[in-house]
Structure formats: structure tokens, C-alpha cells
Amino acid sequence: MFFHGIFLPWVRRFGAWLFWPALAVVAWGELTPHPPRLEGPLMWDKLDHFTAYFGLTLLASLGWGLRRSLVWVFLGIVALGGVLEILQTMVGRDGEWGDFAANDLGALAGLGVAVAYLAIPRRLPADRDRV
């Protein structure tokens, strides 16, 4: 509990700083005409989208999210996913509803993890003795 209170400012800075390069990588991956593909048993297009938007939402929520603004962070990431899916059609790729759904589910999962982390009490309860 006490650990969380000490490191929350660092977690917020980390999220805010890493969001921008992560956003650039996601935008590049979605808008490049021939994105690189990894091979393997878990390499599935929808998993890529889920993971990317999970990370973006987690970083943005930890970096800038206060309880009242987390909904706006989530809606902004969802809107970003929609815009990038539309822009894909302009660079010779296919925008898909399945990709948009995977983006949204990833964003929702990232928001859930951020909310769980931010809900951890920052201080020890007053009636507990410190050891």
C-alpha cells in the first residue's frame, strides 16, 4: 500500500512519456501499406490490435487519467482506433469491423487494469501500525 503512494508519481510520468512513442508505433503499424508480420502460434491480427490498444489505454490512463477523466481517455482511444481504421482504406489496406472491435476490447481491458491500479489506496489506514 505504502509502495503505491511512493511510486505513483513515477508511474504517471512513465505512462505519459511512453504514450507518445507507443502511439507513433501503433499509428505506423496501422497505416503502413505492408506492416511486418511475425510468425508463430499466437500471431493473429486481432491479438495485435487488442495488445496495441491495451497498451495505449493503459499508458494514457496511468499518465493522465484521474477518476473523472478516465472515460474521456477511453473514448479518445476508441475514437483514435476508428479514425485509424478509416485511414487504412486510404493507404491501400482494409479497415475492418473486427479490428475495430479488437481495438475497443483492448482499450477496455487497459482501462480496467488502470482503474484497478489507481484504486489501490495510497496510504496505510490510520489505525494500522507500521512495522
Where are the predicted features?
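Bulky hydrophobic segments
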Residues: 1-100, 104, 108-131
